[in-house]
A protein has these predicted regions:
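Double-stranded RNA-binding/processing signature
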Residues: 1-160
Length: 160
């Protein structure tokens, strides 16, 4: 796949399979996986977009799955599903840390396993998918990455 650094290019097929998505514009994936410590074209703007798309997708999924829930319960459930810890767990599931481009200092200090960096990268990947092919593709990827977590009983979702 072109548009990716060699390190990402070699692992892209595996990462795409885990993500359940192949980028039409692989440079977006490269930027989504680039921490600000690594270069000027980093993932923070993608993270911003991914956060918004993620909140929308999870809110809609909760409303559909739990029509009996009140707004306060829905808000608490959404907060539990989009927080740093949950996003870091999802990032670990698809091994984002192995594909991150980090500056030397961040790499040496264990940045590839730091929950905040993993969570931010997960949001950035969601944002990159949205920029690559739009909302429907981003929704499909988010639902796929979350898997059965979005389908858990209401009590389990609220306990997160």
């Amino acid at each position: 796949m072109t548009g990716l650094p060699a390190r990402l290019n070699a692992a892209n097929d595996t990462f795409s399979a885990r993500l359940g998505y192949t980028f039409a514009r692989p440079a977006l994936l490269a930027q989504a996986l680039t921490h600000r410590s690594h270069g000027a074209q980093h993932n923070e703007r993608f993270e911003f977009i991914g956060d918004a798309v993620l909140n929308c997708v999870v809110a809609a999924a909760l409303c559909e799955r739990f029509p009996q829930m009140q707004e306060g319960e829905l808000s608490r459930a959404r907060a539990g599903l989009v927080n740093r810890d949950m996003l870091a767990r999802l990032a670990q599931r698809i091994d984002i840390g192995a594909h991150l481009l980090l500056g030397e200092g961040e790499l040496k200090s264990g940045g590839a396993t730091r929950p905040s960096i993993l969570a931010d990268a997960m949001e950035a990947v969601f944002g990159a998918v949205f920029l690559d092919r739009g909302f429907d593709s981003a929704r499909d990827v988010i639902v796929g990455v979350y898997g059965d977590i979005l389908g858990e009983p209401a009590g389990a979702v609220l306990a997160k």
